[in-house]
Every structure is written in structure tokens, then in C-alpha cells.
């Protein structure tokens, strides 16, 4: 008998090529910071400002798009990258009241409740929210505003499995097969947002009841030689056979990673060299917020508007390999062609993540790495 699932995956659809997901809105505290109104003239080419964006190392936009923003507003954006989104959030919480920057990007729906509970963000109801479907607006206090959406999934090296005559995994449960021993690398959920998303995917899939639970699954993965890397970059560009020349042909990455492998290849192949295990996918949204304590509130708000606007949104797919959320944006046809769009991505309600995330991570640590 299959194990009882505490959470079930829900059928989703794309609206205007954008994934729309129904996730319960995160519970929010009553103490909400409000961005102060600037008393000095707003930023402009004649009144230039510099702001710092705290983000993960995968943040990217085209130079010409950022340059156009600077030319129009007089705002220069400096990046302070902190590895993974989980690390960026941890550092921002530790520096509360004396923020490392002015704006933070990369907090996702798995980390949202933690960021809101820490009360490190100012509220800002951007006028650009009117162009974003309600499905993506998970924070009704407007401290975290939606920017992108994608799916965290198992990726595998197609050539490795073909050359070695091994069947690639088709489900999470397949990862415990002795035939796949020593082939998987994941990220630590304590420090990595895709790592946390994959942990939540296992909880959604295997649940807590019955003879086989999510804890059983991870115990079996440990016995089957799973490797744990600190973050996505180390796993994908270090351990993964295709991208990093490592010895692990299965990695936790994104549904949009295969089109990235096509886009950057010279010459471009007819088919992607990597593939996605659709049954493993967990829906992920990323958000932007203004850090409390910034001295550049007006400039920070203008940058948030820029990220939510069509110019930046159209630039997101081929730079960060996720889908935009603005309903007026148009993802490139080639990006859509090579991206797998899961029919039934796994999900865990935000309220459950908020209540149990730290305990789940602690249990995972006890099972997998201690």
C-alpha cells in the first residue's frame, strides 16, 4: 500500500505562459514596517543615487536593461551576493536595524514566513502589482512582492544514463533504488532554497503516516549514498556530471535548467543534454523586498517597480531561467519550448511551512548529516 500523503499536489495551469499556482497566503505578524516618505527630491539623472541589492549569486539581468534603468532614474545598483537565498536571508536577519543593503531579492515561498516573522522588511504597495495575477501575491502586507516563478526538480544527465545503460529516475522513490546508489547530489535545506524546496517535495510526497514516511525516504537516501552540498552552485557546477564534471549525474536544480544548457551551448543542440523528473517538481516563487533601515527608500521603491515592470520581466527568463509573473511580459518562445511545465507540482501550504520548517530541517539534519 502506498504511504499516506499529508499534502497532495494540485493541478495548475499556465496563464499567458506564466505558471499560476494556488498557495495559501503566508500568515503575517501585526508589526509591519511602513516605508517612510522621502523628504528630499526623488532620485533622477540630476540627483543620482546608489543602492545595494542583497541577493543570491544567481541573480542576473542584462547589462543594457540595468543601464537603461540607471539612465532613466539616476540610480546605480550595486550587488551584494551571498551565495544562496537562504544565506542572504540569514545575513539580513543578523544585520537587522543596520541592513547590509537597501533591497533584498531571492526570498522564496519556502523562506517567506521566516523573513516576515523577522520583521526586517518595509511595506511597499507598488503600482505594478496591478499587472500581476493574484495567484502570485502571497503577502498581503506588501513586504514581499512577487518577481518570478519556477519549479525545483530533479535534473539528470541524459548521456550518462544512455552510456551506462541505466534507467533514469522517474519519481522520488526511484532514488532509493540500489541501481542509482551514489548518483544523487542535493543541497542542504538549512542553507539552500532549492535544498529546502526538495525537502518539502519529499514531505509532500511521502508525508508522515504509514510505514513509509519522508523520514524513511531520507534514511534510504543516506544509505544509498546521497551527497549533500551547501548550495546550488556547488552541486550543479561542482558535483553534477554534465555541468560541473563531477561524479553525480542526478542533481536538484530547476525545471528551466535544460533550456539554459541549450541556450549557452555552441552550437545549440536540437535537444537538451539534461532532463527533468517531472514527478519531483516543487513550485517556487521568488520575491523582492525593501530592507528596513534603508536611507534610500525612494530609490529602493523605484528599483522594486523596475523589477516588476515589463522590461525587467521580459529579461528574466534568459538570465535567471525562471518565468516572469507580470501578465504583460512575454517569455521567449525558445525558453518555453525547452522548459518543462509540470502539470502537478508538489506543494506544501505556507502555513505548514511556517509552523514546522525549522523542526523539519532539524529532523533532516539528524537523519542525513549527523
Task: List where the protein language model places each region.
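Early extracytoplasmic/lumenal segment of secretory-pathway proteins
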Residues: 28-29, 38-114, 370
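Short beta-strand->loop
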Residues: 121-130, 144-145, 173-176, 255, ...
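Periplasmic solute-binding protein
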Residues: 109-120, 139-167, 195-205, 283-289
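Ligand-binding pocket segment of bilobal, Venus flytrap-like solute-binding proteins
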Residues: 194-279
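A structural signal for short loop-to-beta-strand junctions that line the ligand-binding cleft
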Residues: 99-104, 122-158, 173, 182-189
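Mature extracytoplasmic/periplasmic domains
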Residues: 282, 291-347
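Extracellular/periplasmic bilobal clamshell ligand-binding domains
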Residues: 333-370
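Short, low-complexity disordered leader/linker segments with a strong preference
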Residues: 1-50
Amino acid at each position: 500500500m502506498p504511504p499516506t500523503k499529508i499534502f497532495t499536489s494540485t493541478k495548475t495551469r499556465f496563464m499567458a505562459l506564466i505558471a499560476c499556482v494556488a498557495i495559501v497566503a503566508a500568515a503575517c505578524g501585526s508589526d509591519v514596517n511602513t516605508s517612510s516618505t522621502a523628504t528630499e527630491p526623488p532620485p533622477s539623472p540630476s540627483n543620482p543615487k546608489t543602492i545595494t541589492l542583497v541577493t543570491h549569486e544567481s541573480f542576473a539581468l542584462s547589462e543594457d536593461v540595468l543601464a537603461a534603468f540607471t539612465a532613466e532614474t539616476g540610480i546605480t545598483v550595486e550587488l551584494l551576493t551571498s551565495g544562496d537565498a537562504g544565506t542572504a536571508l540569514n545575513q539580513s536577519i543578523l544585520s537587522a536595524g543596520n541592513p547590509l543593503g537597501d533591497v533584498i531579492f531571492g526570498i522564496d515561498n519556502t523562506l517567506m514566513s521566516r523573513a516576515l516573522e523577522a520583521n526586517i522588511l518595509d511595506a511597499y504597495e507598488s503600482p505594478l502589482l496591478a499587472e500581476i495575477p493574484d495567484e502570485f501575491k502571497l503577502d498581503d502586507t506588501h513586504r514581499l512582492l512577487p518577481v518570478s516563478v519556477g519549479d525545483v526538480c530533479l535534473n539528470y544527465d541524459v548521456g550518462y544514463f544512455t552510456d551506462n545503460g541505466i534507467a533514469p529516475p522517474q519519481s522520488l522513490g526511484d532514488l532509493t533504488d540500489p541501481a542509482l546508489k551514489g548518483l544523487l547530489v542535493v543541497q542542504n535545506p538549512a542553507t539552500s532554497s532549492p535544498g529546502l524546496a526538495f525537502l518539502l517535495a519529499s514531505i509532500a510526497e511521502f508525508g508522515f503516516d504509514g510505514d513509509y514516511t519522508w523520514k524513511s525516504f531520507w534514511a534510504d537516501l543516506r544509505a544509498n549514498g546521497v551527497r549533500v552540498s551547501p548550495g546550488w552552485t556547488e552541486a550543479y557546477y561542482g558535483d553534477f556530471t554534465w555541468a560541473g564534471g563531477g561524479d553525480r549525474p542526478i542533481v536538484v536544480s530547476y525545471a528551466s535548467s535544460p533550456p539554459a544548457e541549450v541556450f549557452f551551448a555552441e552550437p545549440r543542440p536540437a535537444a537538451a543534454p539534461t532532463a527533468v523528473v517531472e514527478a519531483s517538481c516543487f513550485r517556487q516563487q521568488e520575491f523582492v523586498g525593501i530592507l528596513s533601515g534603508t536611507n534610500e527608500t525612494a530609490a529602493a521603491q523605484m528599483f522594486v517597480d523596475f523589477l516588476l515592470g515589463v522590461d525587467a520581466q521580459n529579461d528574466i527568463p534568459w538570465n535567471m531561467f525562471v518565468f516572469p509573473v507580470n501578465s504583460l511580459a512575454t517569455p521567449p518562445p525558445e525558453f518555453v519550448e525547452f522548459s518543462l511545465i509540470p502539470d502537478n507540482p508538489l506543494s506544501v501550504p505556507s502555513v505548514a511551512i511556517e509552523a514546522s520548517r525549522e523542526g523539519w530541517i532539524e529532523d533532516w539534519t539528524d537523519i542525513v548529516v549527523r
